[in-house]
């Protein structure tokens, strides 16, 4: 349970993500003692929690992960932005988010839905939130496995999971 999956640090705030897998719902509790220590030692530190989802069956597409569905079909679904999670309630993992100054780049995929991205947009009013997706990934989860900043003007992007051309403009302009 890497911290980067569960908690997001933006400025002086630590945000607990919703987590979208039922088996990972309680992971945030492991970090609470450390977060409490930071909170007690720094009067400017903010500790926030996104709304914890219920993670009912309505949050997931039935049989989406069936072994009967081949990779080609999954690639088509990824290109169409049709994922295992529905839009029932906000869902996101912190590991689907990269921060570039005032820009938050959020991967829409298996663990982060559009309602989760909207929640982040509303929560971080002083930041620009950008949704991205990587059509070449049949199981899109956690942005740093696909896309990693190295320095201004340079990113590493997995060649099998390319950022669509229309989404590259943000990075080319900056």
Question: Model features per residue range: what roles?
Answer:
Residues 1-174:
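The feature marks the mature, well-folded catalytic cores of soluble enzymes
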């Amino acid at each position: 349970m890497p911290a980067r999956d569960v908690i997001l640090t933006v400025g002086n705030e630590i945000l607990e993500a919703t987590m979208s897998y039922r088996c990972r719902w309680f992971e945030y509790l492991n970090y609470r003692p450390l977060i409490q220590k930071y909170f007690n030692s720094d009067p400017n530190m903010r500790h926030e929690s996104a709304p914890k989802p219920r993670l009912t069956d309505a949050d997931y597409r039935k049989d989406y992960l069936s072994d009967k569905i081949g990779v080609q079909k999954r690639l088509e679904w990824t290109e169409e932005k049709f994922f295992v999670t529905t839009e029932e309630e906000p869902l996101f993992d912190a590991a689907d988010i990269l921060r570039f100054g005032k820009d938050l780049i959020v991967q829409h995929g298996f663990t982060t839905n559009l309602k989760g991205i909207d929640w982040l947009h509303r929560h971080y009013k002083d930041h620009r939130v950008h949704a991205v997706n990587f059509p070449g990934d049949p199981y899109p989860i956690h942005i740093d496995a696909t896309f990693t900043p190295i320095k201004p003007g340079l990113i590493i992007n997995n060649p099998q999971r390319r950022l669509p051309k229309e989404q590259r403009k943000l990075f080319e302009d900056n």
